[in-house]
C-alpha cells in the first residue's frame, strides 16, 4: 500500500493508505471526506464542551438577550422543558447568553467529556506521529461515539436549532465563520505532490510509479489558491540536529585554537633559561640515578 502523509499547508493532518492503481478522482474524494470529517468532529466537540457546561442552546431570537429583555419581550424557550438532561440539571449561567444555563449533572458531564476525549484521540494529528493511518470508518466511529453520548445525556434529544444536532443531521450553517473557511468542498478540492497538482483524470501510479511501498507527502487545498509551498529538503527536527552538530564542532575548534595558542610555551625556544644552560654545559642532564 502507498502511504500518503496528508498536510494542509505546512501542518500535518493524517496518514492515509491507498494503492497506486487508485484513480486520483477517487483519492481526492476519500481524503477530502476524511479532512472535512475531522473538522466536523472538532466543531461538535467544541459545542459539546459548551453543552456540558451550560446546557442546550436557546432559540436564535433569545440569544444574547438579558433576562429583563426576554421578560419584557415575553419570549419563551419551548424546548427548555422538553430537552432536560438525564438525572436532572445544575444551573450554570452562560454569560454570553447563548445557552440556557441548565447544565447536566457532574456524572453526565463526565460522560460527555470522556467521549469527547476518546473521539478526538481517534482522529488526532498525533496518530500520524504514531504512524497510525486514519480512515473514513474511524471518522464515522468517532461521530457515532459523540452521537451516542449526547443521546445518553439527553434522551429526549436536542432542539433543532442546537449546533450539535445540526451537525449530526448535516444541516450546519457555517457561512461567515472561520470554521466555514476551513472546510474544502469536494469539487473544489485539490491534491498536490512535488509541486504538481494530481489531475483527477489520472491514476496515482502516473505520478509515483508502481511501487506499492512508496511514501509521499500530499497537500490538500482549495482550487484557485495556486501551488502550495514545497516541502523543505530536511525536516525541522533534522535541522535542529544539524545545528547542534555544527555548534559542537565549532566549540571543539575553539578549544583547539586555544590549546594551540599556549602550546608554544612548552617549546624549547620559549624557555628563557635554555641558552644559559647551554653555556654552562648543563643541558640535557638527567638526574635519575643509573
Swiss-Prot record:
Entry keywords, A to Z: Cell projection, Cilium, Cytoplasm, Cytoskeleton
Major localisation: cytoplasm
Localization annotation: Cytoplasm; Cytoplasm, Cytoskeleton, Cilium basal body
GO BP, one annotated term: regulation of cilium movement
Alphabetized InterPro entries for the sequence: CFAP298
Summary of the knockout phenotype: Morpholino knockdown of the protein results in loss of cilia-driven fluid flow along the anterior-posterior axis. Multiciliated cells show loss of coordinated cilium polarity with many cilia pointing towards the anterior instead of the posterior. The planar cell polarity (PCP) component prickle2 is uniformly distributed around the cell margin, instead of being asymmetrically localized to the posterior of the cell.
GO CC list: cilium; cytoplasm; cytoskeleton
Residues spanning the membrane: none
Pfam family, one: CFAP298
Domain of life: Eukaryota
Coiled coil: none
Classification via PANTHER family: CILIA- AND FLAGELLA-ASSOCIATED PROTEIN 298, PROTEIN C21ORF59
Function field: Plays a role in motile cilium function, possibly by acting on outer dynein arm assembly. Seems to be important for initiation rather than maintenance of cilium motility. Required for correct positioning of the cilium at the apical cell surface, suggesting an additional role in the planar cell polarity (PCP) pathway. May suppress canonical Wnt signaling activity.
Family: Belongs to the CFAP298 family.
Full protein name: Cilia- and flagella-associated protein 298-A
Gene that encodes it: cfap298-a
Amino acid at each position: 500500500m502507498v502511504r500518503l502523509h496528508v498536510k494542509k499547508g505546512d501542518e500535518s493532518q493524517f496518514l492515509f493508505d491507498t494503492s497506486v492503481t487508485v484513480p486520483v478522482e477517487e483519492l481526492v474524494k476519500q481524503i477530502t471526506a476524511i479532512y472535512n470529517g475531522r473538522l466536523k468532529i472538532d466543531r461538535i466537540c467544541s459545542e459539546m464542551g459548551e453543552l456540558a457546561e451550560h446546557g442546550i442552546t436557546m432559540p436564535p431570537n433569545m440569544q444574547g438577550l438579558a433576562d429583563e429583555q426576554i421578560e419584557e419581550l415575553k419570549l419563551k424557550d419551548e424546548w427548555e422543558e422538553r430537552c432536560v438532561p438525564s438525572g436532572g440539571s445544575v444551573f450554570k449561567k452562560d454569560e454570553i447568553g447563548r445557552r440556557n444555563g441548565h447544565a447536566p449533572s457532574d456524572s453526565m458531564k463526565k460522560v460527555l467529556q470522556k467521549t469527547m476525549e476518546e473521539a478526538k484521540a481517534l482522529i488526532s494529528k498525533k496518530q500520524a506521529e504514531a504512524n497510525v493511518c486514519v480512515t473514513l470508518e474511524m471518522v464515522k466511529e468517532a461521530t457515532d461515539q459523540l452521537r451516542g453520548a449526547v443521546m445518553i445525556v439527553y434522551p429526549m434529544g436536542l432542539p433543532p436549532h442546537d449546533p450539535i444536532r445540526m451537525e449530526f443531521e448535516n444541516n450546519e450553517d457555517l457561512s461567515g465563520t472561520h470554521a466555514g473557511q476551513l472546510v474544502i468542498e469536494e469539487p473544489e478540492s485539490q491534491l498536490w505532490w512535488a509541486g504538481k497538482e494530481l489531475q483527477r483524470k489520472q491514476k496515482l501510479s502516473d505520478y509515483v510509479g508502481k511501487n506499492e511501498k512508496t511514501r509521499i507527502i500530499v497537500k490538500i487545498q482549495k482550487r484557485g489558491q495556486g501551488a502550495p509551498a514545497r516541502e523543505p529538503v530536511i525536516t525541522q527536527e533534522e535541522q535542529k540536529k544539524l545545528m547542534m552538530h555544527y555548534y559542537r564542532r565549532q566549540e571543539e575548534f575553539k578549544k583547539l585554537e586555544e590549546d594551540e595558542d599556549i602550546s608554544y610555551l612548552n617549546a624549547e625556544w620559549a624557555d628563557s633559561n635554555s641558552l644559559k644552560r647551554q653555556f654552562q654545559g648543563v643541558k640535557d642532564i638527567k638526574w635519575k640515578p643509573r
